[in-house]
Amino acid sequence: MIERVKIENLRSHSSTEIEFREGINVLVGPNGAGKTTVLEAITLALFPRTFRSYDHMIREGERRAVVEVVFWGADGHKYKVRREFYRGGGQRNPRLYREEGDGWKVVASGRAEDVDREVMNALGGVDRDVFREAVYIRQGEIAKLVEATREERKRIVDRTLGLAEFKKAREQAHELLRVAEAKLETFRERVRDLKGSKKELKRVERELEELKREVKELEPEVEELKERLNELREAKREFERLEGELRLLENKIESLKGRRDDLRKLVEEGKEAERELQRLGDVPSKVRELENEEAELRRRIEELRNLLDDLRSLRNRLESAEEELEGVKRELEELKDEAGVDPERLVEFKDKIVEASERLRDLRREEELKRKLEKVSDELSELGDREETLQSEYEELQERLDEIQGELKEIRVKEKELLERIESLREAEGECPVCLRKLPRERAEKLLRDAEKELERLQGREEDLRKERRELKDRLESVRRELEGTKERMWRLRERREELERELEEIEELKEELADLSRELGVEEDRLPELRDLAVRAESLLRDLERRRGDVLRLEKELERTLDRCEKVIGRTPSGVEDVEEELRRLEEERDHVGQKLREAEGELERYHNLEEKVKRAREARKELKRIERDLEDAKGRLEQVERNLEGLRERYGSEDRLEEELESVEKKYERVRDKLSEVKGRLNGMEKRREELKKQVRKYREAKERKERLERVVEVLSLCKEVFRYSRDVAREKVLPAVEREASKILQDLSDRYGSLRIEDDGAVIRVSVPGGHFIEADRMSGGEKIIIGLALRLALAMVGSSFAPFIMLDEPTVHLDAEHRERLAQALRELDLGKGRVRQAIVVTHDEELEDAADELWRIENRAGESRVERYSG
């Protein structure tokens, strides 16, 4: 049973301690509050998983996380396991303690494997797999037992009920029996073999003498054949090498002759090409002259075309500009008639007219400005009162903050004195640390408790003062900001009041200016807005008039400059656009004539280049021809040498066929004699080894016989153990499975009216549930929600009946996928569970559904505040 869990810097938990009771303990809170982390902390303490890094579990900004769990073991002792997980460093300093008297004794520490093993022993043999399959039912895995395959389901049931141990023991006995029987049969055969060892030993020694004589005769013959074989093989390789070289030389000579003929042909073609080049003359120079002439004509044509386009464009633009100039003049006449004033005079007074029109709106704002001025004055008065109030509160808060700071200093001095006194009392051995008189143990303990109690009171007071100081600082900062904001607002309002007063003075001046302007223009004041638009329009038209006149003059000058540029191209000043067009046609005809002559010359140029290439190839062919003739002479000389070497081999060994026949004959004889020698030596070595083995076997005969008799007795005992384990498992299953069926059926009926009873068949491989109508169906054929209900009932029943369980279970969000009715039924079922009756004495349930609160013997609420999990106890 879990008694207490402490968490430091694990996920969202900064510092959390929870004490659990026997019965149902419920941790309730919204999603993301950190409920499941409590179950993860228990799992990390008891059976930690091995990660490459635990950084993802350590709280952000912290160096390490610590989990500590106090639990009751299967032996009735209380244990405490503590583990530390470091960022980037894995698990360190794991320790397991057992309570003894008033203190804790270390059971295991240092190596994580040692601590894991002792934790498993303390829980009555529950290992990591059983814990994760049965004790800790994780979110979304309630239906795992129902949805598993038959073999997997049977394996889980056996492990959770302790039946797997019988199977494991029987399998071990079976394996030992198999090994023992194999060894027994081996020794039986050995005993039988050893009986004839003496007779076989004499026979082997006779055969050894015969084999040694035979080896002595065969070894000289093998050496003689080996030497002759090497000589013949070398001769064959030389035959093959020389014949291969001969063929290569003959092919090379033929190839060189063919290449020599080709090169001579190229040389003759080069001579003919040189004569043809002399006849053609300097064709490239002729082509370059025609290309330059054509390029110059193209340049002049392109330039003249561009000038012609410019002339046409300028003529069109000049006509458009003259039409636009006349249009602007007409608009100015119309504006003069509409305004009754010359446009030039309107433009002269435009700025005054516009300003007067704009400021006429200010006259209408006079009353509005007076109201705003009155409102600003009233607000300034109110803010002055608020400033005095805030200043007074700020001074009072600062005074209280100074008082708290002084009291905190006094408390820290007292705490230091108390800590020194406590340390002295703990180190003192029967005498007062102050007066050094003899101090009774009871008196010393009372003084120590009083000092610790006073220290605890001071620490509590210090925490209260620190909390009040934080609140005062927050309020002081809030008042300071509001006071600064008030002063800033008053300064802005004073500026606004001065601005409004200036605007009212300007309005009085404006009235006088408008009257003067109306008299000067000879119009009424109410016509000023109308004249403003006309003045703006008159100014725009006058500017447009000047711009149009400038455009006409500019286009006329540009047209003259373009005609001057045409003179540079055609050599005279053209009379107009038509004259330029006629000159352009003449240049294009001349360009076409030159182009025709160029194409004819380019045809001759291509033939000229081909002839040059032939001359070049002929020069290269002359050089290569000399090299080919030298190579040909060398190849003929080497060919004669190879033929002489081949003739010498034939005189010594005859023809190549005769050499091949002799080589084949010698190889066969050599292999035959060598194989026979190897066989004899192999037999000889085998016989010698066999002789040594037989000598050892004779000595071991009695020992083998004794071991055979002992193994016969062991086989008899193991056969009996195997049957005992099988029978014990069957008896245990017949006893335990009906109890699981009864408990699961009861819980299932509490969870839903739809179901009757639950059956476990085929030793746990098949789960059947009765439905309305009285018939049973397999649980794995039901819907997802039904599987969850059945899986939950079966898990709880296994926990209550199982013999290999720790005396507690943990449920993580068991209401997921359950509707409201089934959540209420689950709560009712948990309330009615008699946890003290079976081995399961405690259930720890994590949920976000408040329906399970009524089922709790102990209720804890977890919330996440500003990224940190906070735990509050609500019952107990």
UniProtKB/Swiss-Prot annotation:
Binding-site positions, Zn(2+): 432, 435
This protein's name: DNA double-strand break repair Rad50 ATPase
Known cofactor(s): Zn(2+)
Domain of life: Archaea
Domain Zinc-hook stretches: 387-484
Cofactor note as given: Binds 1 zinc ion per homodimer.
Entry-linked PROSITE patterns: ZN_HOOK (PS51131)
PANTHER family, A to Z: ABC TRANSPORTER ABCH.3
Subunit architecture: Homodimer. Forms a heterotetramer composed of two Mre11 subunits and two Rad50 subunits.
Keyword DNA repair: yes
Molecular function GO terms recorded: ATP binding; ATP hydrolysis activity; zinc ion binding
Coiled-coil region: 188-528, 575-710
Protein encoded by which gene: rad50
GO BP term, example: double-strand break repair
Function: Part of the Rad50/Mre11 complex, which is involved in the early steps of DNA double-strand break (DSB) repair. The complex may facilitate opening of the processed DNA ends to aid in the recruitment of HerA and NurA. Rad50 controls the balance between DNA end bridging and DNA resection via ATP-dependent structural rearrangements of the Rad50/Mre11 complex.
UniProt: ATP binding residues: 11, 31-37, 139
Family the entry assigns: Belongs to the SMC family. RAD50 subfamily.
Alphabetical keyword list: ATP-binding, Coiled coil, DNA damage, DNA repair, Hydrolase, Metal-binding, Nucleotide-binding, Zinc
UniProt xrefs under SMART domains: AAA
Notes concerning its domains: The two conserved Cys that bind zinc constitute the zinc-hook, which separates the large intramolecular coiled coil regions. The 2 Cys residues coordinate one molecule of zinc with the help of the 2 Cys residues of the zinc-hook of another Rad50 molecule, thereby forming a V-shaped homodimer.
Keyword Repressor: no
